[in-house]
Design a protein with these regions (language model features):
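Amphipathic terminal alpha-helices
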Residues: 198-219
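NAD(P)-dependent short-chain dehydrogenase/reductase
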Residues: 69-71, 75, 79-129, 133, ...
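Glycine-rich NAD(P)-binding loop of the Rossmann-fold in SDR/ketoreductase-type enzymes
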Residues: 12, 31-42, 68, 72-73, ...
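A recurrent short beta-strand within the Rossmann-like NAD(P)-dependent oxidoreductase core
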Residues: 92-93, 113, 117, 132, ...
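NAD(P)H-binding glycine-rich loop region in Rossmannoid oxidoreductase-like domains
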Residues: 2-35, 46, 64
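C-terminal "lid/loop" region of Rossmann-like NAD(P)-dependent oxidoreductases
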Residues: 144-147, 155-185
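Conserved Rossmann-fold NAD(P)-dependent oxidoreductase catalytic core, especially the SDR/UDP-sugar
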Residues: 15, 38-71, 86
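Active-site segment of SDR-like NAD(P)-dependent oxidoreductases
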Residues: 20-23, 59-67, 91-94
Length: 219
């Protein structure tokens, strides 16, 4: 990323590019810093120079940023963002396109081997989109610098796994992972946003759809 001026007419920037995965960040901390922080700074500086508002993906990991290079990189992004650039602290996102290593992807793909007692606020990807669109439609002026984007309801990973019908052992989670990432979404709700689908509802829908599809398969 070497641009020092905007080549096109740009009204708004939605910056979601980053390397995710807390566990991987423990092995490649320099890559996470360069990609998530240094490259983001170029975007932030360029947009600020050209008066372009920005919404960017932060993370609930900032609440325990010291536990991992990933969390550190997201905390640093918030520190270097300029006025008019808003960080959305996503909790644990699920839905189409999620990484195969994510909990809900493992549930859908049948690759769950164990569960933990971590508490996760699982947020549907379409609810993430609706949160972003609030700022696209209303702008970033006179708003907070960060907002937490989650349902506001945390559930144990082991309970989610059981709800999906898996009987797997419970193990200790990694120290690098937050014990509880439940969001305080009160500020975002003041702007008219609210979540529409819980993780358990999504699981029930997937089970029903998969069952219906199996009924339609030739015998």
């Amino acid at each position: 990323f070497t641009a020092d001026k905007v080549q096109f007419d740009v009204d708004f920037v939605i910056h979601l590019a980053a390397i995710a995965d807390v566990r991987r960040s423990l092995k490649e901390p320099e890559l996470y810093w360069k990609t998530n922080v240094e490259y983001s700074k170029k975007i932030f500086d360029l947009c600020y120079k050209n008066n372009i508002p920005v919404v960017y993906a932060s993370s609930s990991c900032v609440h325990a940023w010291w536990k991992s290079p990933y969390g550190t990189s997201k905390k640093a992004m918030e520190a270097i963002a300029h006025p008019g650039q808003i960080g959305l602290r996503f909790t644990t996102v699920f839905g189409e396109g999620a990484r195969d290593t994510m909990l809900m992807s493992r549930i859908r793909n049948g690759t769950v081997k164990f569960a933990t007692e971590h508490i996760r606020d699982l947020i549907f990807v379409e609810d993430i989109v609706s949160a972003i669109m609030i700022f696209v439609n209303t702008g970033t002026k006179n708003k907070n610098t960060t907002y937490e984007v989650g349902t506001g309801q945390g559930t144990k990973v082991s309970d989610i796994v059981k709800h999906a019908g898996y009987n797997v052992p419970t193990q200790e989670g990694q120290d690098a992972e937050a014990d509880d990432n439940t969001a305080n979404n009160s500020e975002l709700r003041k702007l008219g946003w609210k979540p529409t689908l819980t993780a358990k509802e999504w699981i029930d829908i997937r089970i029903a759809v998969d069952y219906t599809n199996r009924l339609g398969e030739p015998k």
